[in-house]
Amino acid sequence: MATCLDSLGPLLGGAANSTDAANYICNRFTDTSSAVDATYLLFSAYLVFAMQLGFAMLCAGSVRAKNSMNIMLTNVLDAAAGALFYYLFGFAFAFGTPSKGFIGKQFFGLKHMPQTGYDYDFFLFQWAFAIAAAGITSGSIAERTRFSAYLIYSAFLTGFVYPVVSHWFWSTDGWASAGRLTGPLLFKSGVIDFAGSGVVHLVGGIAGLWGAFIEGPRIGRFDAAGRTVAMKGHSASLVVLGTFLLWFGWFGFNPGSFTTISKIYGESGTIDGQWSAVGRTAVTTSLAGSVAALTTLYGKRWLTGHWNVTDVCNGLLGGFAAITAGCSVVDPWASVICGFVSAWVLIGCNKLSLILKFDDPLEATQLHAGCGAWGIIFTALFARREYVELIYGVPGRPYGLFMGGGGRLLAAHIVQILVIVGWVSATMGTLFYVLHRFGLLRVSPATEMEGMDPTCHGGFGYVDEDEGERRVRAKSAAETARVEPRKSPEQAAAGQFV
């Protein structure tokens, strides 16, 4: 590809100082391109961070009213604690190079930042991803977990567990990263987990799986005979609001994972650039979620006989979780297949959870772990060669099995699923078990029955009227009683006042 200097040289005609002039102009273009890319990444980070509001609304609507304030507070805690611990340790473990492929060891407390390839905008973007994983887990253990346990697990997940996984698959020297610059690629391919079906969703889902399993189901979720007792969330409106906020944020989550937008593929002046890939990624994301929502709508109608908005919202999010790995390397038609299958994966996981008496109030484990795992496999089947080579910059890479690319990518992705499940189980499973053994994980039965809001947070999240309104109403009623003429039954019948 011709450089800026090569293109400008002939235009300047070899005039005096033409080289200096060309250098100046090219540097200005480079600065502008860097500014555009930084703005794009920051805007994407803001969108991903806005997903925390979506998580909060979705969680609040999916639990009972007596626990709504508790679950919203945990979402605030995930963001706040995650910011501190990802700043101190997490970013260093995730992207500190050089390393031996397992864990980073530079940038603790953002020391030596910024430098080439790692600026503050990149830290902000990655922090927003880290707290998304923690938010997934909080939904699985809702309505029965001590608030102190949230603080402990959130700090551990965002500061250590999640960063190690992201180093493996996203760092430039991670042992399984498709973008690895030093050392051999896993199966000569590396793992293509573009925006985190495995790194974010499978990690958060497996962590939630262990938390919910060790805690056990909520009181009353299953009766003495083992039959399921419905515990519906208190607000479908909040669920829908949260779902749309998450959909909006996913346009930063998936397309934003390019981290730049001004990169050119091929010769300058063509339409073949990263901006086109960004647009295609947004399309595949929307299609996968939309098809999953429609499939869930009619699938649940067929199974249960009614239309359920909460099921549709979860199906939509399941499609998003699945397409996240391969959103940049598959065609739009393939994303339709991804969404269709992800809906049935979610329905099947929900059926299995009831059989096993597994209680996840938000279906977070089924949605993020189940659909995330499917998304990893889907990418290994449908990744297109041209997109893989353009995005990862190396010709001859393995690509999707169904697209003629062989089985190397599929083998790498199976390894990804296995190591994530093993790592998160060993770390988060152990943490939840230790908290359980020391009585720090689950609230008392009395607290759970009464509700987390009145027992732990000073009152209910919803108040019909405040104390001042009650006093005004009582005073008005008393004054009315004093001035209103009273009638005896006989006088009332005769139309006379006392």
UniProtKB/Swiss-Prot annotation:
Localization per record: Membrane
A GO molecular function held by the record: ammonium channel activity
PROSITE patterns, per database record: AMMONIUM_TRANSP
Family annotation (Pfam families): Ammonium_transp
Domain of life assignment: Eukaryota
Keywords: Ammonia transport, Membrane, Transmembrane, Transmembrane helix, Transport
Transmembrane regions listed in the UniProt entry: 41-61, 76-96, 122-142, 150-170, 194-214, 238-258, 277-299, 307-327, 329-349, 362-382, 414-434
Induction (record text): Down-regulated by ammonium or glutamine supply in roots.
Biological processes, Gene Ontology terms: ammonium homeostasis; ammonium transmembrane transport
Tissue distribution of the protein: Expressed in roots.
Annotated membrane topology: Multi-pass membrane protein
Disordered as annotated region, ranges: 473-498
Record keyword tRNA-binding present: no
GO annotations of cellular component type: plasma membrane
UniProt keyword annotation of Cell cycle present: no
Family: Belongs to the ammonia transporter channel (TC 1.A.11.2) family.
Function as written in the Swiss-Prot or TrEMBL entry: Ammonium transporter probably involved in ammonium uptake from the soil.
Protein name: Ammonium transporter 1 member 3
Primary gene name: AMT1-3
